[in-house]
Design a protein with these regions (language model features):
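Hydrophobic alpha-helix feature that most strongly marks membrane-spanning transmembrane helices
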Residues: 10, 39-42, 49, 83-90
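C-terminal amphipathic helix plus adjacent low-complexity
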Residues: 76-161
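A short, structure-level motif marking secondary-structure boundaries and short turns
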Residues: 12, 28-31, 92
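A donor-sugar binding/catalytic signature common to diverse glycosyltransferases
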Residues: 23-70
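Short acidic-hydrophobic, aromatic-tinged amphipathic segments that line or gate anion-handling sites
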Residues: 17-20, 69-84
Length: 161
């Protein structure tokens, strides 16, 4: 992913650091030393909350509003939340119930939720050769990916055994 970001943004401000999968430090190392997480859409915010660290969600990520993040709706609310948390970090650590909610949500997200999808970001062109659009929209493709596509366009999702 770091390669994708560097290709899209060849000039990055000096205060922004991209951590590649091959770097000696990783996001989990950063979580260990963090007092606060600021998340937009990645799972890092959820994983930070799993460690009892408060997380302010800036975007509309899937775990927003699940009871273990701070969810401002405006920029003014964001800066108020940021000031409140930074003024008393220990008081804003997640309690046991909030941390358990983060763990429960993460388990369901990583192990129960994954749905079949024909293309992945990292191997998109290879996947596209195996699953060209016409094949995905064929009877075979719809039988394999139809429920996923219905969910992605907002139809109610039915869990199957």
């Amino acid at each position: 992913m770091a390669t994708v970001v560097r290709e899209a943004l060849p000039e990055i401000p000096e205060h922004i650091h991209i951590i590649a999968a091959t770097d000696k430090i990783n996001t989990y190392d950063l979580i260990e030393i963090a007092d606060l997480g600021l998340a937009y859409t990645t799972t890092v915010g959820m994983e930070t909350a799993m460690n009892g660290i408060p997380v302010i969600c800036c975007g509309h990520t899937h775990y927003r509003g699940r009871g273990f993040t701070i969810d401002p709706n405006t920029w003014d609310e964001y800066f108020v939340a940021l000031e409140q948390v930074l003024s008393d970090l220990p008081a804003h650590r997640l309690n046991e119930e909030q941390t358990a909610k983060a763990w429960n949500y993460a388990y369901r997200f990583f192990f129960e939720y994954p749905r079949p999808f024909p293309w992945r970001l990292m191997n998109f062109w290879d996947d596209l050769e195996v699953w060209p659009v016409g094949k995905v929209l064929s009877e075979e493709g719809i039988s394999q990916f139809g429920d996923t596509f219905k969910f992605l366009v907002g139809e109610p999702f039915t869990w199957k055994d």
